[in-house]
């Protein structure tokens, strides 16, 4: 599967955020989307997810004119959005009930909790009492159950403790084989550790940086240099 973006653009009043973007993402890879704060990473994700309307461009799959649908995309926000008046178990059951016809090979609720390393004592707690990391796990879990072809992750490891962040990285690596994963971050070392391809969002355009040597100082300097270009303009 391929996820094809053609001539995507978005402006807010006089500020151009996305400028005539052409890019193709391929199945089986985790793409690290790097950019400075305010570069437009979240705007790009919101356009891809149809949360906001792009000014122009096409978003298709497999290089054919089949528009990407809501079922194609899972979106994990940097700040988890969950119904805090429900328990973890109630939320998971509600999600599975309303998506019963589309969930492939469903498992029991406890099997899903086990998969995400959510402890038995936490499963019947209200979501408002979950930590940031646990809410993030629940948000990831419903996207895993839905099995979207394209997974957008907007800085999902922000504010997670070391253990939960490592669990999430291992999970993403295990899931990448049959989907396209686009991981937004401004933390370069995290992108280099987790991602197969590095993509810069820079001056409203996407640019691939070849990963010739992940550990080389030269490689990191190239990324930093590209992001610094024009910062004083």
Located regions from the model:
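Catalytic Walker B motif of ABC-type/P-loop ATPase nucleotide-binding domains
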Residues: 151-155
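Conserved ABC transporter NBD signature motif
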Residues: 54-69, 208
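Conserved structural motif at the start of ABC-family nucleotide-binding domains
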Residues: 3-5, 18-20
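Helix-to-loop junction immediately C-terminal to a conserved catalytic motif
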Residues: 49
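The feature captures the beta-strand-to-loop junction immediately N-terminal to the Walker
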Residues: 34-36
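Helix N-cap at the start of a conserved alpha-helix in ABC-type nucleotide-binding domains
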Residues: 162-164
């Amino acid at each position: 599967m391929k996820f094809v973006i053609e001539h995507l653009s978005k402006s807010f009043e006089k500020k151009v955020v996305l400028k005539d973007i052409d890019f193709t993402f391929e199945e089986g890879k985790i793409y690290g989307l790097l950019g400075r704060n305010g570069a437009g990473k979240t705007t790009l994700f919101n356009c891809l997810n149809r949360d906001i309307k792009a000014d122009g461009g096409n978003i298709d799959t497999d290089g054919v004119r089949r528009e990407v649908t809501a079922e194609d995309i899972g979106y994990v926000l940097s700040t988890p959005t969950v119904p805090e008046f429900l328990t973890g178990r109630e939320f998971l059951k509600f999600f599975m009930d309303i998506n019963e016809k589309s969930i492939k090979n469903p498992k029991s609720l406890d099997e899903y909790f086990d998969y995400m390393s959510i402890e038995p004592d936490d499963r019947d707690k209200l979501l408002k009492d979950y930590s940031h990391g646990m809410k993030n796990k629940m948000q990831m879990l419903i996207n895993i159950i839905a099995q979207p072809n394209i997974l957008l992750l907007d800085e999902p490891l922000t504010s997670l403790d070391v253990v939960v962040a490592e669990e999430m990285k291992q999970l993403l690596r295990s899931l990448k084989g049959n989907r396209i994963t686009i991981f937004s971050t401004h933390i370069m070392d995290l992108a280099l550790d987790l991602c197969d391809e590095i993509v810069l969002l820079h001056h409203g355009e996407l640019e691939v940086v070849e990963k010739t040597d992940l550990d080389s100082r030269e490689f990191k300097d190239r990324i930093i240099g590209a992001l610094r270009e024009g910062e004083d303009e």
